[in-house]
Regions:
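Short beta-strand scaffold segments in enzyme catalytic cores
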Residues: 4-9
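Short acidic-glycine loop/turn motifs at beta-strand connectors
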Residues: 10-15, 107-109
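Low-complexity intrinsically disordered segments
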Residues: 35-121
Length: 121
């Protein structure tokens, strides 16, 4: 069905749109390493981190499919802000994920993964 991932950037207050990857979920860690180089000096900038990540994805994904972006639904936005502090936030993100590579929450301060694991759908 794919190697899907949903990537969301946050600083604990602001939350980016969701970046959807259909085939490249396993590439997220490598692309985040590339993003760290691009974002030097702008650590913590949720909007630019998300935008530049989308740009990196765009250069790697051929055609007009397999890369999407949409607004985070309000309940998920609240959940992202609470993650990883509660079991409930993990459950809600698991239910929101599309399976495969799961939901990836990226801390915009230093672009570290707050979560990168398969979450059951």
């Amino acid at each position: 069905m794919g190697n899907r991932a949903l990537i969301i950037f946050t600083d604990g207050e602001r939350v980016s749109p969701v970046v959807y990857l259909h085939w490249c979920g396993d590439q997220v860690p490598a692309w985040l390493n590339d993003l760290k180089q691009l974002m030097r000096g702008r650590e913590g900038d949720v909007d630019y981190s998300c935008a530049r990540f989308i740009g990196l994805c765009h250069t790697q994904i051929v055609g007009n499919l397999s890369l999407g972006v949409w607004n985070v639904p309000t309940p998920i936005e609240r959940t992202v802000r609470a993650f990883p502090t509660t079991d409930r936030s993990r459950e809600q993100l698991a239910a929101y994920g599309h399976g495969d590579a799961g939901v990836v929450i990226v801390n915009a301060h230093g672009l570290h993964l707050a979560s990168l694991r398969r979450l059951p759908a």
